[in-house]
Amino acid sequence: MTIIEKYYAMNKALNQALAAQGVNARAYKYGAVPKGASYPYFQSAYRVTYRQPFASSISGVLTNFEFILNFFTAAPSDEANDAKLFEPYEIARELITSPESFIWGGIATLLSHDETPEFRLKGGLEVLQRGLVFACQTVTTFVSSIHGGEEIAVDDVIDTIREALHEEV
């Protein structure tokens, strides 16, 4: 699996574990929260910190990376208990770090984790955010096992772009 495939597998494992615990918060890749999604939810991202040099396209590569998991929640009213709002966050951290659940087993090895500073976004609704950074290690490949779809000629792509631009004008 490539690093991006590992990242998606980690998100999937987290979402399945959260659903099994009865938690209604879901993890979305960074920048892809669907319209209509409600609080609470997670956004994740990853950053490669080290990739083993001199690997071939056939062999696996030892890769260190950070899995960043940000949690967003908002109180439905001023009377809401902040501690209760962060229960999905605490459950997710426990699911990921606990040797009993081991939700990322077979995908990546968790080396350590750290919390990011908490902050509040104020606007029409006060949004609370907490984050976790997981230092992970895994073996990745350079070749994706996901089928790329069908081939499309460059001329067809250019025609599609021109049509889209023409319709907007």
Regions found by a protein language model. Give the residues of each.
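Charged, amphipathic alpha-helical segments and their flanking helix caps
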Residues: 1-33, 49-169
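A short, hydrophobic beta-strand-centered structural micro-motif
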Residues: 37-51
